[in-house]
């Protein structure tokens, strides 16, 4: 009789584990500690002078399975990260001198998330001086990150989401560390 009582609980847990969980922008943005490290190295030409164009690529998460990264979530993470290091202006006016264009090219995930989940991402970044139209920076940044089984025991989709967010946070961190080396 006790076993019969466990069946509805097990069914509920399996249904909840099957729901799609989209990646969120804030966990993809760089941490305050990373922002503090980078902020001191930002060239004067980039301080409050980098805007973000509409991000291309990305995919909405399905209702029942998986975890994807939408273009809007990546754009919000980029804007938050640029703001944290002092590159993004506080208001849209006056218009910033530079425009960062980003395209999510690749999101490699396992078909069936197992014990540990490793996700690979590739994002193409282009920084354009809007006054001259000159490309100041262009690079495809690819990296991987993972989420362990212990971080989301019940939900494989939650592990995918965690790995997505970590991989993109590391990707944005690499971008910002590249940008502070430029002298436009």
PLM segments and residue spans:
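Short secondary-structure boundary motifs at beta->alpha junctions and helix caps
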Residues: 60-69, 131-177
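Sec-dependent bacterial lipoprotein signal peptides
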Residues: 1-19
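Short, intrinsically disordered/low-complexity patches at protein termini
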Residues: 46-49, 123-125, 159-162
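Sec-exported extracytoplasmic/periplasmic mature domains
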Residues: 79-87, 109, 172-184
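Short alpha-helical interface patches
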Residues: 71-83, 95
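Surface-exposed short loop/turn segments
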Residues: 20-29, 85, 89-138, 145-158
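A structural "domain/chain start" motif
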Residues: 19-76, 179-184
């Amino acid at each position: 009789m006790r076993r019969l009582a466990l069946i509805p609980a097990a069914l509920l847990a399996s249904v909840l584990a099957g729901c799609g969980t989209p990646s969120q922008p804030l966990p993809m943005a760089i941490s305050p500690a990373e922002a503090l490290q980078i902020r001191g190295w930002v060239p004067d030409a980039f301080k409050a002078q980098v805007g973000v164009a509409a991000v291309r690529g990305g995919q909405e998460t399905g209702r029942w399975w998986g975890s994807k990264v939408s273009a809007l979530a990546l754009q919000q993470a980029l804007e938050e990260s640029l703001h944290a290091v002092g590159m993004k202006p506080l208001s849209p006016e006056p218009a910033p001198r530079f425009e960062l264009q980003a395209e999510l090219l690749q999101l490699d995930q396992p078909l069936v998330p197992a014990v540990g989940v490793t996700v690979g991402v590739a994002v193409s970044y282009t920084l354009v001086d809007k006054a001259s139209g000159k490309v100041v920076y262009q690079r495809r940044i690819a990296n991987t990150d993972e989420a362990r089984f212990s971080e989301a025991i019940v939900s494989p989709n939650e592990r995918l989401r965690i790995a997505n967010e970590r991989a993109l946070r590391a990707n944005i961190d690499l971008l910002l560390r590249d940008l502070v080396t430029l002298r436009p």
